[in-house]
């Protein structure tokens, strides 16, 4: 069974979502592909537990982070935050991490879901999954008109406007979402 990984609009560094053209593609870029709330951290390891220090990081326990840049490769990769003892520290499991202060230019950020951008144009994307054994199904998103988001799935795509074997007819495959709000929209 896959674990649930989620993000919320109230997290520090989370992208804002509004009726501004491109806001939805920026949100998906952050959550699916790039991550967000990047911080430079220092890490010390004791007994298989890493304690990271980053000023006002805003991270939340049990959320996934991506650690990069540690000279000890055992510390790098996606991990789950174990505890948040203070606004400047958090801990995570560090099996294989040698006791002591980690070397390197180390960064942390909310881990992306592991998708990539197969095709891109201004405020249009074709996203695909990157895990081994995946199929070539893609998510297509068009946020070129304010307050309207077109999205749909397909077996593959050769460009942002060229779908191969879309799921259903265009009427069923492309969904249009329109909202008349002017303030940022809360999201999970």
Predicted regions and their residues:
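Predominantly extracellular/luminal regions of secreted and cell-surface proteins
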Residues: 17-18
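Surface-exposed ligand/attachment interfaces on beta-rich extracellular proteins
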Residues: 47-55
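Short coil-to-beta transition motif at edge beta-strands of beta-rich domains
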Residues: 54-72
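Small/polar beta-strand repeat architecture
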Residues: 4-8, 14, 29-48, 71-188
């Amino acid at each position: 069974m896959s674990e649930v990984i989620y993000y919320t609009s109230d997290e520090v560094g989370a992208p804002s979502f509004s009726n501004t053209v491109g806001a939805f593609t920026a949100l998906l870029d952050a959550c699916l592909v790039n991550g967000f709330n990047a911080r430079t951290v220092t890490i010390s390891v004791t007994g298989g537990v890493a304690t990271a220090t980053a000023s006002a990081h805003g991270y939340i326990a049990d959320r996934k982070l991506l650690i990069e840049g540690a000279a000890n490769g055992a510390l790098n990769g996606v991990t789950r935050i174990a505890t948040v003892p203070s606004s400047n520290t958090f801990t995570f499991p560090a099996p294989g991490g040698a006791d002591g202060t980690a070397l390197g230019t180390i960064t942390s950020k909310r881990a992306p879901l592991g998708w990539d951008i197969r095709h891109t144009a201004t405020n249009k994307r074709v996203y695909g999954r990157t895990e081994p054994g995946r199929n070539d199904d893609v998510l297509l998103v068009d946020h070129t008109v304010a307050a309207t988001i077109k999205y749909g799935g397909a077996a593959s795509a050769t460009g942002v406007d060229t779908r191969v074997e879309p799921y259903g007819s265009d009427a069923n495959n492309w969904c249009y979402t329109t909202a008349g709000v002017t303030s940022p929209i809360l999201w999970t």
